Amino acid sequence: MKPPSSIQTSEFDSSDEEPIEDEQTPIQISWLPLSRVNYSQFLGLCALPGCKFKDVRRNIQKDTEELKSCGIQDVFVFCTRGELSKYRVPNLLDLYHQYGIITHHHPIPDGGAPDIASCCEIMEELEICLQNNRKTLIHCYGGLGRSCLVAACLLLYLSDTVSPQQAIDSLRDLRGSGAIQTIKQYNYLHEFRDKLAAHLSSRESLSRSVSR
């Protein structure tokens, strides 16, 4: 009897008799609605495509083809180069390029948060993607910590009316209770607007002094 398609048998089969096959299930993309921040688009979040680690046996070619068939035009990757090697997808960024997907690589340490200058750069690039109506996806390793943090920051960046807790709740409703995983990420989100304002102010002051 064939198991239900929703069960990924490679995760449950402990037999050593057969080599572990790649998972056949399509990569799961969660779509965050941006209507509350006055954008009609959705932002995609997912786990690392092609990942081979412990019980996870994804196929990099199939996953990338799936993203392309979903119409993904831009992808933001928050894994470090070291992680891409560890999870056996060292050429993922090149593969995206081969498929014509614009790649934005902003490495953030696992469990961590970007410095405010890097985060501001990510926000500005994401906003340009949305303004140009480009179908955009973001991912880290599990699609829960760094990706959800960046998505929550985007909600705060695009709207003054969304509170940090509302942003967290939106991501946890979408990705589960594991979204925004560490105290560092939680605190970062609550301090985001103040740090962003200070960063933009200092950047503006520097720009004025240079132009004199």
From Swiss-Prot:
A Gene Ontology molecular function term of the record: protein serine/threonine phosphatase activity
EC number, UniProt record: 3.1.3.16, 3.1.3.48
InterPro entries assigned: CDK_inhib_3, CDKN3, Prot-tyrosine_phosphatase-like, PTP, Tyr_Pase_cat, Tyr_Pase_dom, TYR_PHOSPHATASE_DUAL_dom
Enzyme class: hydrolase
Catalytic activity: O-phospho-L-tyrosyl-[protein] + H2O = L-tyrosyl-[protein] + phosphate; O-phospho-L-seryl-[protein] + H2O = L-seryl-[protein] + phosphate; O-phospho-L-threonyl-[protein] + H2O = L-threonyl-[protein] + phosphate
Superkingdom: Eukaryota
Region ranges (Disordered): 1-23
Subunit structure: Interacts with cyclin-dependent kinases such as CDK1, CDK2 and CDK3. Does not interact with CDK4. Interacts (via C-terminus) with phosphorylated CDK2 (via C-terminal helix). Interacts with MS4A3 (via C-terminus); the interaction enhances CDKN3 enzymatic activity.
Family: Belongs to the protein-tyrosine phosphatase family.
PANTHER family: TYROSINE SPECIFIC PROTEIN PHOSPHATASE AND DUAL SPECIFICITY PROTEIN PHOSPHATASE (PTHR23339)
UniProt function note: May play a role in cell cycle regulation. Dual specificity phosphatase active toward substrates containing either phosphotyrosine or phosphoserine residues. Dephosphorylates CDK2 at 'Thr-160' in a cyclin-dependent manner.
Name of the protein this chain belongs to: Cyclin-dependent kinase inhibitor 3
Native source species: Sus scrofa (Pig)
